Amino acid sequence: MALTETRSDTDATSAGDRARRAPSAVEQLIGSGDHTSIGRLFIGFGFALASLSLTLWALTGVDALTDNGFLGSRPAQLAASAQVALLFLGIVPLLLGVAIAVVPLQLGSPSIAFPRAATLSFWTWLLSSGIFAVSIALDGGVLGGDETAAKLGNVSLGAVLVALSLGAVCVATTVMAHRPLGMRLAWVPGLSWASLVSAALLLVTLGSAIAHTVLGQVGRMGPAALATNFTDGLGWLLRGPAVFVFAIPVLGIAIDVVVTASGRRFAHTDVLQLIVGLYAILAFGAWAQLPSALNTALWTLFAFGITVPILGLLGAIGDSLRQGKPVVSPALILSIVSVLLLMGAAVTGWVQSLSLAGQGTLFGASPATLASAQTAFVAGAALLGGAAASLHWSPLLWGGPGNSVEGRLTVPLLVLGGGLLGTTLLVQSVVQLDGETTAFQIFGLLVAVGAGLLAL
């Protein structure tokens, strides 16, 4: 006797409802492969963590103003950790988020390459960034004195670098493989080209840095050894030429913003791509990790040579604006000033090269303070470039106009903060008045004000 199994209509309906159940808001947020959503998350958290990093840097300035009044023995550790956080928790993910959100739209691609990998990149970066921030608070981060917190900072920093590298792979693959049929690389917009070049340089730069964090973990290093590992193995990321790598997308943002503002394309786009490529070559700094690489002919060539593409881009921007009828907007002002801040970083490299010339007594400038000045200039340029991109592509990113009152209010704060922070550190390194209490307090006040304005 055969039995025929049947399901009631109610069971069938409930099964269908379960199959068609829409994912919750949390599930959509975590599992989204939409490139604009991922990009917005990178941009938003990048701005927020950059602000926190600058606030921490400003606190070290306030501590100097009060003659080491409340941070005790931690100013050096907090200043170094703030600069590392500003780069890898702030400006790099910020510009990466701009690329993830905008580049597919520029190329006419419906999505970014490896969307799940891009999502994984963001959540890994966010979780690791939170752990790194906690380690800083516990006297870890970089140059920290607590053993457990220092190890936690080293591991979390390595995870941050891995996550950013994964995101860079997604962007580079999108530019290489998701272009429409017939579009050559020579025809891609400025941001797409700069993002491709930036991704390539990030992979080789961050890959070398990841190796040093792995050595710190495998070697079971204590706080003192990890501090030495950072100074000798990762400190090169905070000085030229390597620090310029993190601002490569700023050049592409400036190109696209100027094209829109002037209403005309640049006459020679191939020359602009050459300028971005030359900048990237001269920003490659993994070869200059050891202190012995400084004060060499090659290092001096890189320090002075980076000026050429920056001046070339400024000249191209000026010529384009002169021939067109530019519409002045907050994005245009921020993008131009961002390139000028890169010029400030290049001038800081000149000072360092001249100071190290011969026996290193020409200026007697502080190498550590000069490196901080370069980091400040580059970080300021990246923040201004990221803000310019956020305003310029505001309809695509946020669904509203970028020429708002809030956007206009951010311009003076960012311009003054970026210029003041870098210039203060540059002047402080040259005049060498650290031994005088009053001068030390004045410089501390200016650093606090500059970092505070950028944080706002």
Predicted regions and their residues:
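Membrane-embedded and interfacial regions of multi-pass energy-transducing membrane proteins
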Residues: 2-456
